[in-house]
Each structure stands twice: as C-alpha cells, then as structure tokens.
C-alpha cells in the first residue's frame, strides 16, 4: 500500500550504513501493506490483514517478505501512508529519550533538527512524558510547525546564536537532554550548553559531517553522551 523513504535507506544504497544487505536487494526499510501469504507455523497474523513492517529492505517492491515478529497489525482506520512512516521515527525517539535518556517529567529537552521526521516525533514523545521542549530548526516556518505540534519554545539557528538562545530559554541552566539527529556545526555549541548531569543523545548525522565533541565537557559537567 505504501512505503517510506528514511535517511537510513539513502545510506544503505550507498553502502554507508551499519546494516549491509547482500546484493542484489530491494531497498525500502519500512512499509505498510496487506498480508498475502503466511509462512509455516506463523501465528498472530492472517491473510488479508493490514500490517506495518520494518524489516530493513524490500519496501520498494510490489511484494516483500517480512518476519512475522516485525509486522505490526493495523486497524482499518489507520492510513497506509501514515503507517508506513510511523515505526522507525517513533521507535527511534522513544528508545533515545525514554530508554537511553531516562527522561523524567519536568525536565527540559532540546531537539535539534526538530522539524524533521525523528525531530517531530521527539517533540511529541517528550511532551507526552511531561517534559518542556525547546525545538531548534532552520527557518521560521519550521519553528512554527514545531510549536503547532507541542514545542514550548523554539530556536532558529539560521539567525540566532545557539548558545545564547539556549541560555536565555533555560535561565542559564541548559537543557537536561539534547536530542541530536543532525550533527554538523550546531552540535558543539549545543553540547557546550547542556545542563549539569545532562544527557546528549546522538541520533544521527543528517548534515553529513560527524562532529568532534569536546570530551572534557563530559567530566566538568558530569554529562552522559549516548
């Protein structure tokens, strides 16, 4: 029914991702469709049932094989286009913020690249967990989108000083968690602005360059990076 194009898909076809499928393969890590057949011994799924899948490959074909354990049954009311773009970004943000970041209600989260897929999911998950969210994006339009989906404050790093704006928005304390799917030139000023015993979550490097972060900050601020 539908397949999404995620940043890992671009890396996979360039052989730059940690998962390197054997050639030849059909790209498309995440998709939604209807079960056409079941393997021997498969339980919990039925032929004709709608599912969303995240098997890593196959989504850009007319048919795909997927392990049953990686198929999520869908209600008929869930649009295929939404379902095909749901699992990866929300699972990524939930794992980063809740499992690795140990986010607690009342903490402040800074989301870099906040208007993208994982960024918008991070805003929603952090708000659902009771956090205050600062969304950083590259335009006023993107910042407005972030506010519409729940961000408490925004930072436009195309014309605002990252460290100064973060300091102003946190009364000089800094964010407890920084969620970074972007990397690049704004990673270091954000990293240097983190709160005492904060957590820096490295989710990806969508900007291209992998930043070299000052490790001394981890000792002086007792912060954790993941």
Located regions from the model:
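Glycine-rich phosphate-binding loop and adjacent beta-alpha segment
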Residues: 137, 146, 182-221, 225
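Glycine-rich beta-strand-centered segment in the early N-terminal region that forms part
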Residues: 1-4, 16-58
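N-terminal Rossmann-like NAD(P) cofactor-binding module of classical short-chain dehydrogenase/reductase
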Residues: 52, 110, 155, 178-179
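Conserved beta-strand positions in the Rossmann-like core of class I SAM-dependent methyltransferases
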Residues: 36, 134, 201
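Short amphipathic alpha-helix with an adjacent loop that forms part of the alpha/beta core around
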Residues: 161-172
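NAD(P)H dinucleotide-binding glycine-rich loop of Rossmann-like/cofactor-binding domains
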Residues: 11, 20-24, 50-115, 148
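Mid-domain Rossmann-like dinucleotide-binding core that forms the NAD(H)/NADP(H) cofactor-binding site
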Residues: 46, 84-160
